[in-house]
Amino acid sequence: MREETAEQPAPLRSGLTTGSCATATSLAAARLLLSGQISDAVEIVLPKGKQVQMRLEFCRRVDNFAEAGTLKDAGDDPDVTHGALVFARVRQEAAPGVRFVAGAGVGSVTRPGLVLAVGEPAINPVPRRMMTEHLLRLAEELGYSGGFEVTIGVEGGEALALKTMNPRLGILGGLSILGTSGIVRPFSCAAYIASIHQGIDVATTNGYRHIAACTGNASEDTMRRVYNIPDIALIEMGDFVGAVLKHLRKVPVDKLSLCGGFGKISKLAAGHMDLHSRHSSIDLPQLALWAAQVGADAALQQQILHANTSQQALAMCAAAGVPLGDEVCRHALAFARSVVPATVEVEVFAIDRQGGVVGQAGVALSKEHT
């Protein structure tokens, strides 16, 4: 009889950033423009020196410009741009250097606070540098002394951008061309964390000294209801509360409101910076201990230890008149205060699934606005 063994999971596959796609397509288009060479694939050098070959969907000459396109391959990362067509159109210019233009599906910066100036196409610094280095190297090889106008676009990018933080950051009209290493690491969440940092930067640069960091839509709605806070000052942190707290060391605000579901706030109270279930779990013994500190008897503590969920434990305490929600928020507040500068006023809200507040700490209910 054949012995069955557990199948080993295959390693997750890395992909390439939109910045790498833009570099490959602009290089292919420029080469066609200057030498007449049509490419079906092109090799580029990533920022750390690794060489990669990228397949092209098209490479053609049209009137006074050349264009090339490639499909974004994010590997096994759940990237919103996976499978999108990234394209470049390149024209020659008399002045040396490279000038970037936002094509269809690539956004433009409309608010200060980002690394790019207002009015600039949302093509981040590393992709700009990658494209510039490749194009200037090509120009030197071919003896070309002029410059390039490079238009980068993403097919369907305007619709895809609505699934990102771009509209809230003031990047309108499409996606950003991103990447610092040129490689997409599966589930690294680097882009999400970068968007959290950008959100804080944009809010503070535009004069908002009170921000609310929220785990999801329900907590954002709660913050709007409590403070009538504008979207620009709402930071969609998801599970990455650590990204918010640590960034405030560099970019402090006057006031930080943290709002999330009771379970996630209980993880923060236990000292976790990443609230996702992959990295932290509900600690029922700790909940029982906190409940005991605010009046839970031994029988209720045992019930909490055998609860199926944190919400069930909270409901048990509510029925017994034990303010577990507030106690958890107090511990979350203490931990958050230990991370951010002492000058930052912090408050914490825990909510239920309907967005109702089930616990709070550090809250001066003056309804002050930003």
UniProtKB/Swiss-Prot annotation:
Catalytic activity of the protein: Co-precorrin-5B + S-adenosyl-L-methionine = Co-precorrin-6A + S-adenosyl-L-homocysteine
GO aspect biological process, one term: anaerobic cobalamin biosynthetic process
Coiled coil feature spans: none
Keyword Lipoprotein attached: no
Keyword Cell membrane annotated: no
EC numbers for this chain: 2.1.1.195
HAMAP family linked to this entry: CbiD
PANTHER family linked: COBALT-PRECORRIN-5B C(1)-METHYLTRANSFERASE
Family as reported in the entry's similarity comment: Belongs to the CbiD family.
Name of the protein in question: Cobalt-precorrin-5B C(1)-methyltransferase
Origin species: Pseudomonas syringae pv. tomato (strain ATCC BAA-871 / DC3000)
Encoding gene (name): cbiD
